[in-house]
Structures are given as structure tokens and as C-alpha cells.
Amino acid sequence: MANYIHVPPGSPEVPKLDVTVQDQEEQRCRDGALSLLRHLRPHWDPREVTLQLFTDGITNKLIACYVGDTMEDVVLVRIYGNKTELLVDRDEEVKSFRVLQAHGCAPQLYCTFNNGLCYEFIQGEALDPQHVCNPAIFRLIARQLAKIHAIHAHNGWIPKSNLWLKMGKYFSLIPTGFADENINKRFLSEIPSPQLLQEEMTWMKELLSSLGSPVVLCHNDLLCKNIIYNEKQGDVQFIDYEYSGYNYLAYDIGNHFNEFAGVSDVDYSLYPDRELQGQWLRSYLEAYKEYKGFGSDVTEKEVETLFIQVNQFALASHFFWGLWALIQAKYSTIEFDFLGYAVVRFNQYFKMKPEVTALKMPE
């Protein structure tokens, strides 16, 4: 969903290192990481460097590099997943990272390398579904998302969403079948036909484009593990900007609400109810108006309008990640049931569709 992201003047340049980090064998992975650290932390003794693999990601591999026991200075090395260049524009990702960093919304980006990037580790706890429904935490999340959404486009330029372009690209990349007979049988029986998917995309674009949701700089992938909560400082930070770009404001929130259900063991009974959404959206609108300089008074009508936009755009989120998961099922080397995840997302799309399309905008 990238769309002419402009890096502010004066933003520090990001070095590109001619290093490839192999992630299939532990020793070769370590050798590659140490090659990066020779540039980024030349004072570290390579023999004392600890590498810790984080296992939550389902797009890339993430490794923490540090010396000693305290983890005060940690370099994160993110190795791009196999064929993820089909899904992610890596140049736009770096631009998003730099824009967010310039506005105090992202950690420091140390460098890029041939198959990944390195950045600053944020101290805190990566959240789980039980955290994001806690009012003390979800109000922080709402405010932080509002801060990102309020970032001005360059020179008053009015951005357009690339959601439909990106969705169309993903649709063109979905596999037509799988070599494994059992997987292929499941694919053909449980995934909607390409014709039906095409019809749904056309219908969705017509409905959602008419809702009047502003196009803003969005995170676009605000799952629980991409939110870092620092209890001591009382704040949250978002990480992983590879899907960031200009998109409908309501999509970003609807996508986050879908993520209340989790990723590895999805449970849509955890989708936030109307009361929780009302509190969340009010906190968001108050902060968004403050950041935009519109005061902070929020009416019931504004909350209700955003509620409807968000829940209808949640459909597009299910559809988008359903297509994404089908592509990952074909190419990813990460241990995860991507086909099963696609089934779950498309099933929830069709389950949710009649309920949310029945919602009517307030008079």
C-alpha cells in the first residue's frame, strides 16, 4: 500500500551493506550477523556476541544480537522471508521506516543489507490478545495510531490508497494448485474459486471506496506482536513497517481489531464488542483531533460513523491477508500453516459480511 512516501529533508541516510545473511544453517547465520556487526558495533568482541532467534514472525526471521546479560544495547537483524519481495516493496518499507522515525514513531534504522535490515531494539513486552483489550493499554494503542495517522503528507499533497492495486497484485499471484496432493485437495475444496474472489473484490471496492474514510499514512499490520508495551514508561511503540503506506484510516483500525483474535491459534470470539470499540474509537478520535489541531471534542455521531467504517473495512483486511496467506503457502519456508490461515480469514470474511453490511450510517 505504498504511495509516494516522502522522506523529510534532513533525515539521516541509511547505509546499505553488501552482506547476505544465510538463515538455513546456524553457523552461516552467525557469520552473516557478525559481518553486519563489524560495521554497526565494531567495538564488540565477536566471541562474546549472543544471537537469539525470535520465533513469532510469519513473514521474516528476526534475530537479536547483543553482548553481556543485560540486553541494554541490542541490534535486531531481520532476514527477509523467501519470495517476500512479491508481497513487500522493500524500498517503500525503508521510506516508511524513515518517515516514522523522523516523527518519533519508530526505532532507529541502522542499515539495510542484501536480504534484510538492522534496527534498534525497543525495550518492552510484545503484546498478546489478552493485553489489547485492557483499557489502560488499548487507549495507548489508539493514541499512538492516531499520532501516525496525523502525520502530514508532503507539501499538502493528497495521497491515494493503493489498497485495491495491492490486492489486485496479490490476486494475480495466488497459486492455481499445489504439488502435494493432500494440500491441493484442501486448497480446491476450502478456498473460494478465483471467479468468486474476483467478484468479491469488485463488490468490496465499490462499497468501501464510497465510505469517505480519509487516506492517511497507515501501519497496515498492527497485530499484537507488533505492539511493544513499556510498562515502566507507560507507552507503546509499533514495530515492523513492511506493509506500511498510504491507506484508508478505517482499514488500519479494522485490521487491528481483527488481530484481537491472534495469529497462530485464531479465535474470533475475541473480536472487540461494540462497547469496547466505542471506547477505543473515542480515545482514537480525541487524540487524532488533538494531533491535527482540531481540538478534542468528539460527538457520538463521529464515533458511530467511524465504527461503521472500521467494521466494514475489516472485511478488506480479512480478504487481503487471505490472499497473502495463499502466496505464502506456496513460497514461504517458515513453519506455519499458511493454507489453514487463508481458510480461516476467508471464512471469517463471509461470516462477517452480512452483519457489517447491514450497518447504516447515522443521519
UniProtKB/Swiss-Prot annotation:
The keyword Chloroplast does not apply. Keywords: ATP-binding, Cytoplasm, Kinase, Lipid biosynthesis, Lipid metabolism, Nucleotide-binding, Phospholipid biosynthesis, Phospholipid metabolism, Transferase. It comes from the Eukaryota. InterPro entries: Kinase-like_dom_sf. It is found in: Cytoplasm. Its main location: cytoplasm. Pathway: Phospholipid metabolism; phosphatidylethanolamine biosynthesis; phosphatidylethanolamine from ethanolamine: step 1/3. CDD domains: ETNK_euk. GO terms for biological process: phosphatidylethanolamine biosynthetic process. Its EC number is 2.7.1.82. GO terms for cellular component: cytoplasm. The keyword Amino-acid biosynthesis does not apply. GO terms for molecular function: ATP binding; ethanolamine kinase activity. It catalyses: ethanolamine + ATP = phosphoethanolamine + ADP + H(+). Highly specific for ethanolamine phosphorylation. May be a rate-controlling step in phosphatidylethanolamine biosynthesis. Belongs to the choline/ethanolamine kinase family. This is Ethanolamine kinase 1. It comes from Mus musculus (Mouse).
